[in-house]
Amino acid sequence: MSCSLRSGLVIVFCFILLLLSSNVGCASAARRLRSHKHHHHKVASLDVFNGGERRRALGGVETGEEVVVMDYPQPHRKPPIHNEKS
């Protein structure tokens, strides 16, 4: 087996290994999306007051996942209603 053929096979093997390892992450992400789509997991939603700021905390109840705190800015004005008949 020539040296260039061997190095080509090594590159192809590494490329296939890279694709397989990236598909593992995609499969777990697809599982997470599918579980949210079918609502198999309940999600806790809590209003958290931290130093005068209102935040919404989301976390999985059944899965025991880590709770993620997300900031939601308060609207500065009332949004317009476009479908109101005059």
From Swiss-Prot:
One Pfam family recorded for the sequence: GLV1-2
Gene Ontology CC terms, in alphabetical order: endoplasmic reticulum; extracellular space
Tissue: Expressed in stems, hypocotyls, cotyledons, leaves, flowers, shoot apex, siliques, stamens and petals.
Alphabetically ordered keywords of this record: Differentiation, Endoplasmic reticulum, Growth factor, Hydroxylation, Secreted, Signal, Sulfation
Biological process, per Gene Ontology: cell differentiation; lateral root development; positive gravitropism; positive regulation of cell population proliferation; regulation of asymmetric cell division; regulation of auxin polar transport; regulation of lateral root development; regulation of protein localization
GO molecular function: growth factor activity; hormone activity
Main location: endoplasmic reticulum
Annotated signal sequence range: 1-29
Disulfide bonding pattern of the chain: none
Propeptide: 30-70, 84-86
Hydroxyproline PTM sites in chain numbering: 80
Consequences of knocking out this gene: Reduced hypocotyl bending and dose-dependent altered root gravitropism associated with an altered PIN2 traffic that impairs the formation of auxin gradients, thus leading to an irregular waves root shape.
Location of Sulfotyrosine modifications: 72
Induction record: Rapidly induced by auxin.
Subcellular location: Endoplasmic reticulum
Additional facts recorded: 'Golven' means irregular waves in Dutch.
Similarity comment: family membership: Belongs to the RGF family.
Protein name (database record): Protein GOLVEN 1
Lineage: Eukaryota, Viridiplantae, Streptophyta, Embryophyta, Tracheophyta
